Design a protein with these regions (language model features):
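Short, C-terminally biased terminal segments at protein or domain edges
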Residues: 1-48, 52-114
């Protein structure tokens, strides 16, 4: 069965990896490393949540994914604001799209837990 959240997280992680390779080629190592960690961690936590042991475990993993998503947004904003960093507006758009799906699922999960 297709899972739009999982699919979108893989798409975003792949785009993050490609963008980080561009950053590394431009010798922007520090932010590249930070972005690579947070941007790929989103999907890792979403994938882990798919096999959660309980509803609480699922919610916890999804909350971690949202934190990583927000960190990823932060690094992308810094790159966009900097005059010496290449920007990747498509990546920012995809991260925002992933966030909308993620927040909706998390919100629904929290409400259904009560």
């Amino acid at each position: 069965m297709k899972n739009p959240l999982v699919d979108k997280s893989i798409e975003v992680a792949s785009m993050v990896i490609n963008y980080c390779e561009v950053l590394q080629a431009e010798r922007k190592y520090v932010i590249s490393r930070q972005l690579l960690k947070s941007g790929t961690s989103i999907g890792a936590n979403i994938h882990e949540a798919q096999n959660a042991e309980s509803k609480a475990d699922f919610i916890h993993k999804m909350k971690i994914a949202t934190k990583e998503l927000e960190e990823t947004k932060y690094w992308l904003i810094l790159c966009e604001k900097s005059k010496t960093y290449p920007t990747h507006l498509d990546l920012s758009k995809k991260v925002n799209e992933l966030g909308l799906i993620l927040y909706k699922i998390l919100s629904t999960s929290i409400k259904s837990r009560k």
